């Protein structure tokens, strides 16, 4: 409730007034809630009068910061509003209804890292923005100066708002139908960099301690959506996450990517050997071996030759209407052709696979990294890493191996992946998965 003196000044007296408020930046949700391992915080935001009166503002109004913002906007009309805050009220999908109401002219602002503030965890951008609420402009894109912790200007960055006119990447990937039996599983977390860490590919679905399905493995990967999911996966990981782009949104792309086979196949190879591709033969059949038994010098036949058939164009589409209105399948109908960069990744991976089967698969020997390591003829890259690196007492995979040859081969693979990522990155902006 506004004090009477303050209310009188605002309503009657033409004096300039500067008001300093330190609103609580408490959110109803947190990381555990996002991953479905926790619940919304009780009574953080849904017990206030502001919350009750502004249900039309969507999920954003759950946050006390947004409640302060909208109350100032409505009760002190025409004021100049300046604030330090996260960027979500400018670009997050949950704040689309909020931005339909909050109309103002952006005057000036800058971005700095969150870790320059006391008692703030994480590395993400904090924006200082000044708004003239007497001019009602729709927020479309805002340019900020970016400063580091030493007050050094790094660049100018544009923050784009999604206001229903520009969709995020989520409706794009979910329109591809998963027809047939599952080959693996993946997920679709919130479409910004901060949520990339939850994205992975696995051989089986994973469940949380409470029995609910983990979001990271809720979607089937089948022949009909494999290539789009690998593109989605690559798009989200190719561009390195930093504190500056932590809240940037991945978007529904233009259609130009559909005809770019090199881009599609580059993403296919990149996703196949990325560290977050955690397909393991221990969880089920490994359908994603891109090499023949002869190439790897092993005698035992693989359980699945799906990926080889897919790459050779031997998988037939079971339905033409894969893309809905586009009526186009992304199952190859002829052998996939790869760029030099992608071929280099495949060759580096092949050398690593050969070394694994040579060392771990030597019949008649008891070669092991530790007691929990076993030879898997159908091993995926994740299994190979586990074999050579082992796990610590907490069950986490060690970051290094004592095997120097393995380390050399793995580094070769990582380096070729980095070069491939550099080739993919410009296309991500060209096809508008991200905006510069």
Predicted stretch roles:
Residues 2-83, 89-96:
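SAM-dependent methyltransferase catalytic-core segment centered on the flexible catalytic loop
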Residues 68-71, 94-102, 124-130:
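Alpha-helical scaffold elements adjacent to nucleotide-binding pockets in ATP/GTP-utilizing enzyme cores
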Residues 73-80, 104-107, 133-138:
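Secondary-structure boundary elements
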Residues 84-87, 114-116:
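Acidic carboxylate-rich catalytic motifs and surrounding loops in phosphoryl-/glycosyl-chemistry enzymes
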Residues 91, 118-121:
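Short glycine/serine/proline-enriched coil/turn segments at secondary-structure junctions
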Residues 106-117:
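Conserved S-adenosyl-L-methionine
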Residues 123-192:
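Flexible, glycine-/basic-rich loop-and-beta segments that form/coincide
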Residues 198-436:
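C-terminal target-recognition/interaction regions appended to catalytic cores
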């Amino acid at each position: 409730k506004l004090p009477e003196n303050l209310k009188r000044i605002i309503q009657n007296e033409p004096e300039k007034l500067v008001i300093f408020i330190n609103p609580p930046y408490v959110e109803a949700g947190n990381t555990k809630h996002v991953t479905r391992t926790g619940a919304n915080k009780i009574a953080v935001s849904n017990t206030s009068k502001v919350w009750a009166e502004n249900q039309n503002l969507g999920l954003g109004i759950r946050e006390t910061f947004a409640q302060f913002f909208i109350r100032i906007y409505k009760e002190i009309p025409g004021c100049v509003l300046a604030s330090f805050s996260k960027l979500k009220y400018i670009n997050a999908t949950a704040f689309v209804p909020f931005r339909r109401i909050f109309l103002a002219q952006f005057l000036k602002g800058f971005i700095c890292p969150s870790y320059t503030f006391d008692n703030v965890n994480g590395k993400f951008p904090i924006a200082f923005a000044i708004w003239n609420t007497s001019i009602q402009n729709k927020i479309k894109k805002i340019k900020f100066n970016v400063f580091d912790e030493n007050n050094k200007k790094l660049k100018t960055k544009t923050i784009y708002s999604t206001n229903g006119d520009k969709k995020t990447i989520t409706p794009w990937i979910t329109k591809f139908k998963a027809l047939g039996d599952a080959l693996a599983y993946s997920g679709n977390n919130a479409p910004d960099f901060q949520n990339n860490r939850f994205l992975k590919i696995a051989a089986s679905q994973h469940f949380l301690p409470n029995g609910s399905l983990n979001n990271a493995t809720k979607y089937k990967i089948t022949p009909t959506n494999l290539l789009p999911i690998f593109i989605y996966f690559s798009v989200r990981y190719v561009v390195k996450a930093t504190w500056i782009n932590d809240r940037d949104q991945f978007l529904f792309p233009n259609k130009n990517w559909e005809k770019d086979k090199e881009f599609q196949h580059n993403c296919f190879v990149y996703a196949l050997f990325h560290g977050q591709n955690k397909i393991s033969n221990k969880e089920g059949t490994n359908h994603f071996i891109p090499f023949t038994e002869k190439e790897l010098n092993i005698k035992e036949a693989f359980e699945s030759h799906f990926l080889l058939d897919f790459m050779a164009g031997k998988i037939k589409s079971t339905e033409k209407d894969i893309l809905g209105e586009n009526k186009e399948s992304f199952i190859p109908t002829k052998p996939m052709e790869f760029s030099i960069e992608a071929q280099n990744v495949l060759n580096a991976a092949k050398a690593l696979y050969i070394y694994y089967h040579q060392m771990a698969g030597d019949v008649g020997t008891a070669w092991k990294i530790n007691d929990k390591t076993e030879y898997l003829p159908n091993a995926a890259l994740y299994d190979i890493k586990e074999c050579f690196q082992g796990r610590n007492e907490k069950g986490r995979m060690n970051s290094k191996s004592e095997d120097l040859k393995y380390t050399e081969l793995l580094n070769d693979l990582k380096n070729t992946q980095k070069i491939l990522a550099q080739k993919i990155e410009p296309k991500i902006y060209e096809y508008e998965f991200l905006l510069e």
